[in-house]
Amino acid sequence: LTIHTVMENMVVGILLIFALQWLFLGNLRSAIIVAATIPFALAFAILILVLQGESANLLSVGALDFGLVVDACVIMVENIFRHMVERSAAAENGQGRYTMASRFGAVLGASSEVSRGIFFAAAIIIASFLPLFTLTGVEGHIFGPMAKTYAYAITGGLIATFTVAPVLATL
């Protein structure tokens, strides 16, 4: 397993997530927004690992599951775009104009609808990795960094879901 192989697999994973998001939601913009959160989450995880003195090695970073990382963002972005379509349709039916303010309102409305569920789902996933933080010995050296990488990447994905995704959707 080389760094080249891991990087290659990461790129393929991001492209697959992008393609599936675009295929199933039928919205190129939402696919781009979801794909944009992956580098943020990965950088966040590696930064936290390095700041803690941990090694962001091939085993820990290579084990990442981007599906878990972007899960919350997919839900948020889909709900935001659903709200935007509803507001746009209302504007076309003569119920006001569709402006930047109405886009912002759609983002706020959509975010408030799903934020608790997204937060608690991510918290449960992160909590499932916490026992692995305390392992000692060989197991701790193998599974500890992997668990931390997962937890930090999901936390980074959650931060991106509540910050990066709504801003990009508003533009």
PLM region descriptions:
Residues 1-171:
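Hydrophobic regular secondary-structure detector
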